[in-house]
Amino acid sequence: MYPQRTQHQQRLTELLDAIKTEFDYASNEASSFKKVQEDYDSKYQQQAAEMQQIRQTVYDLELAHRKIKEAYEEEILRLKNELDTRDRQMKNGFQQQQQQQQQQQQQQQQQQQQIVAPPAAPPAPPTPVTSLSVIDKSQYIVNPTQRANHVKEIPPFLQDLDIAKANPEFKKQHLEYYVLYNPAFSKDLDIDMVHSLDHSSVVCCVRFSRDGKFIATGCNKTTQVFNVTTGELVAKLIDESSNENKDDNTTASGDLYIRSVCFSPDGKLLATGAEDKLIRIWDLSTKRIIKILRGHEQDIYSLDFFPDGDRLVSGSGDRSVRIWDLRTSQCSLTLSIEDGVTTVAVSPDGKLIAAGSLDRTVRVWDSTTGFLVERLDSGNENGNGHEDSVYSVAFSNNGEQIASGSLDRTVKLWHLEGKSDKKSTCEVTYIGHKDFVLSVCCTPDNEYILSGSKDRGVIFWDQASGNPLLMLQGHRNSVISVAVSLNSKGTEGIFATGSGDCKARIWKWTKK
């Protein structure tokens, strides 16, 4: 009996030894794997540091290049302005010389008449000037040969916006707004306010639905949808979870401004972009969020749906434009540029996307391939591109042109050639605003361009000629956003404005 127990003990000892051997082997192997992993981690960190260094070097080079380019452009602009000033001085000197010669001739003629002619009756008192018939209309009209020029004089009726000083013939005054008309043209357009919509904070954006029945507005933490006809509030959209999630997406001030809103083509969905880097897709029938698109690393400033309704384009301060597939909620294409993106737009046929940025440039890409089709900037052949950040872009209804508004106080109209061997050109530069241009849009008939500015005004421009037809002063603060209803017709239309005075307003224009 005892010998058998001894055999069991020996067997147990052998098994324990085998287990110990296996454990030692596994421990050695684990140590080996750990060492390999540490080597891999070390190499990864080293390569990541090298990549970060390379990226920083590239950013530094881009910054240096941009500064050098800006310095050259500023010097060129200074020289151009100096030449323009010199030309104007020479022209004024020549005109003064001519006037002096004419005065001398008139004095000589009067002296001769006094010698040979009998005394004349005393001169009649001067007739006060109240009509434009004796005013030089050329000061109010853009010279056709200078349509695209970046440097032009502001028409006199836009230089002083004091309604009390305006000619009664060329103004319309209301308790809450007034309109100044260009005296060189007949008052064919009339502007009336339809609704004034109060908000609790600055109105950052306004946008009509495709059928023109509804308008969406974005302000602090809230998106609202109104009936255009009645002005009734039909939806108030607030993401309550944004107040609960105090993570990296929360702004330091606790504010969450809705920077952009856009209806889907069928009007069933509303996309909103905000400071927390998120794009929210709302179902308007339930007033609930059905998708959240994540990927941007900074504030989202602009959104636009594609005509098919399955894709959405976004622009962000993180220097990227992204195209989203709403069927998968994934980003299908990312387009990176040198500076923050402030505005995006999709062409009517969905084939092109345009973006404006802080680097004073409008870029146009093929929406399918991501190929850069056009770069519209101050470096074009004629040197008549924008000279400051571009804050708004809009395609014309036929998709052949792009309007852009900039902090350089101008609006520009670009003709898209769509050919690799021929560059797109700036057709018209619209001069008249006295401060930053923050928003632009085109009427569906391509007859007018509307622009909103920090000078609190909205200007109606004749798209083809570049002439300012009228200025609407309808807010007490900057006009941050302007939008036109797509169902506007040639003789009448609806547009909306959003302002820093915490109001969104719906307006109607009629053409006589």
UniProtKB/Swiss-Prot annotation:
Keyword field contains Transmembrane:
no
Q: Which UniProt keywords apply?
A: Repeat, Repressor, Transcription, Transcription regulation, Virulence, WD repeat
Gene Ontology biological-process annotations:
cell-cell adhesion; cellular response to copper ion; cellular response to farnesol; cellular response to starvation; development of symbiont in host; DNA damage response; filamentous growth; filamentous growth of a population of unicellular organisms
Pro residues bias: start-end ranges: 119-128
* UniProt cross-references to Gene3D superfamilies, sorted A to Z: 1.20.5.340, YVTN repeat-like/Quinoprotein amine dehydrogenase
The ranges of region (Disordered) come to 90-130
Explain what the UniProt record notes about the effect of disrupting the gene for this protein.
Leads to exclusive filamentous growth.
Q: Which GO terms describe its cellular component?
A: nucleus; SCF ubiquitin ligase complex; transcription repressor complex
UniProt xrefs under InterPro entries: G-protein_beta_WD-40_rep (IPR020472), Gprotein_B (IPR001632), Tscrpt_rep_Tup1_N (IPR013890), WD40/YVTN_repeat-like_dom_sf (IPR015943), WD40_repeat_CS (IPR019775), WD40_repeat_dom_sf (IPR036322), WD40_rpt (IPR001680)
One Pfam annotation, family name? Tup_N
Residue stretches of each WD repeat: 198-238, 253-294, 295-334, 336-375, 385-424, 432-471, 474-511
PANTHER family xref list: F-BOX AND WD REPEAT DOMAIN CONTAINING 7, WD40 REPEAT PROTEIN
Q: What does this protein do?
A: Represses transcription by RNA polymerase II. Represses genes responsible for initiating filamentous growth such as HWP1, RBT1, RBT2, RBT4, RBT5, RBT7 and WAP1; and this repression is lifted under inducing environmental conditions. Also represses genes which participate in pathogenesis. Crucial component of the response to farnesol. Plays an important role in the regulation of white-opaque switching.
Q: What is this protein called?
A: Transcriptional repressor TUP1
Organism source for this protein?
Answer: Candida albicans (strain SC5314 / ATCC MYA-2876)
Q: What is the lineage of its organism?
A: Eukaryota, Fungi, Dikarya, Ascomycota, Saccharomycotina
